[in-house]
Amino acid sequence: MATEGNNLSQYDKNTIPNAKDFRFGIVVSEWNEEITEGLFQGAFDAWIENGVQKENIVRWNVPGSFELIYGCKKMQQSFEMLDAIVAVGNVIQGETKHFDFVCDGVTQGIKDLNVQTDIPVIFCVLTDNNIEQSRARSGGKHGNKGTEAAIAAIKMAQLRKDAKFYKG
């Protein structure tokens, strides 16, 4: 396993753009709440640590990971001033093909939002084989994918800002 023994949430703060003026949205699935709350906390803490003001973070909840697509789309439409959105979910492999359908649908839906709209949506959906893997990646021994998603959101917000500058 590529992540075995590694905490993937370590980053060099000096390589992160100044985020004090950025505004972020985060849409969180209520399914597997233990995991998604850990991911949310990782993202929130990373934003605060990098200068984002609490009042510049908007959170919405949706029932499950499949609903993240609609939640992110509506957040884009409702808060056009947002610089990026993070979609937080967790799908754990079961005995049926439901896992595959949900994972494929969410992945394609988030991709479509990125292609069709101007506010970047960061994919922070854990797709693990079991709950232990999810725990390890939501604040456990492998770090917190929520932290990584927040850093990606900051970098994409900066890219979006830079692209607008060059466009004129």
Swiss-Prot record:
BP term (GO), one: riboflavin biosynthetic process
GO MF annotation list: 6,7-dimethyl-8-ribityllumazine synthase activity
Function: Catalyzes the formation of 6,7-dimethyl-8-ribityllumazine by condensation of 5-amino-6-(D-ribitylamino)uracil with 3,4-dihydroxy-2-butanone 4-phosphate. This is the penultimate step in the biosynthesis of riboflavin.
Protein name: 6,7-dimethyl-8-ribityllumazine synthase
Stated family: Belongs to the DMRL synthase family.
Binding site for (2S)-2-hydroxy-3-oxobutyl phosphate: 95-96, 137
Reaction equation(s) it catalyzes: (2S)-2-hydroxy-3-oxobutyl phosphate + 5-amino-6-(D-ribitylamino)uracil = 6,7-dimethyl-8-(1-D-ribityl)lumazine + phosphate + 2 H2O + H(+)
Binding site for 5-amino-6-(D-ribitylamino)uracil: 31, 65-67, 90-92, 123
Enzyme Commission number: 2.5.1.78
Keywords from the UniProt entry: Riboflavin biosynthesis, Transferase
HAMAP family in UniProt: Lumazine_synth
Pathway in which this enzyme or protein is active: Cofactor biosynthesis; riboflavin biosynthesis; riboflavin from 2-hydroxy-3-oxobutyl phosphate and 5-amino-6-(D-ribitylamino)uracil: step 1/2
One Pfam family, short name: DMRL_synthase
CC annotations in GO: cytosol; riboflavin synthase complex
EC primary class: transferase
UniProt-annotated catalytic positions: 98
Highest taxon in the source lineage: Bacteria
InterPro entries cross-referenced by the UniProt entry: LS (IPR034964), LS/RS (IPR002180), LS/RS_sf (IPR036467)
